[in-house]
Amino acid sequence: MRINRTVLYFIIVISFFFFNFYFRPVQGNPLMTGKYKNSSAYVNNLYVSDEFFKKNSMNKDEYYIYEHLIDDVKKGKGHSIIKCKTKGCSATYMTAYEAIYLDHPELIAFQSSSWKESDNTLDVSYLLLGKLQAFLGTRRIEREISIVQKETKNMTDKEKILFVYNYVASHDYDHLFMYSSSNQSAYSFFTKGTSVCAGFAKASQLLFQNIGIKSYLVMNTDHMWNYVEYEGKYYVFDATMGTGFRKDSNNYYSGLGETTVGVTKGYFENIYPPIEDTKLRTVFGV
């Protein structure tokens, strides 16, 4: 039986598309090990989390909710009931939620949550990506990261940091849907090409780890950014700043030392390493 040429051409194009974006061999995260994959911290191959915020900021109640929440999300549960051990469930939940947000930028399936508190019990609902969507999204992001790994392979740390800044800032800020839950993870950045500060910061965090640069995620009520290490010191890094300016603008590199919201302190500030007052753009001379 002869196959129609149009059909054959379509099959070839589709096969190439899926291979290139989802199944092409990649280098992978250099920190990923079999031991880590068997740990409770493992979510996917994008990121190795040391769960810094869980280990350094949680009391017993917050730790309990953190474990409960992330376990439910990894299992794809859309709803759960959490029995709190002490009063003040909502505040405890928010602290745990924020810590997970910072510890796990690779958790692309988790878009948002809502909850009701009654009789020291939380009734929590999660908005999650579908399992297939999350699987394909993870595969796509792995392949996007691999391109950056190849581009930065022989770069100095300064060149790598500038590369990530330029790469992230080249994407568009989604002003139309800036409060959409779908924009709050790295998924929107890597698969749609648009995002908001949360997506930009999480994408930066994933990229930094995969190319050998140490960094932290930072957030407050209004914004999310990074602290990045350069020559043993930590500096403010906010690629969202770059999305608002042309690359030839004097303000383009403002994010190497400033944040979009004008503050450089976030939640859990007391557990971060000291942050330099000197702007990274001054150190880099850009």
What are these regions (language model features)?
Residues 2-25:
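Sec-dependent N-terminal signal peptides of Gram-positive bacterial secreted proteins and lipoproteins
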Residues 18-155, 265-286:
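N-terminal accessory/pre-domain segments preceding catalytic cores
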Residues 80, 171-178, 191, 242, ...:
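Repeated polar recognition positions within modular binding domains
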Residues 86, 154, 190-194, 198:
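Short, charged/polar micro-motifs that form catalytic or ligand-binding hotspots
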Residues 135-189:
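Secondary-structure boundary elements
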Residues 181-189, 195, 203-206, 248:
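Conserved active-site-adjacent core of cysteine acyl-enzyme catalytic domains
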Residues 199-262:
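Hydrophobic/aromatic-rich core segments of domains that either
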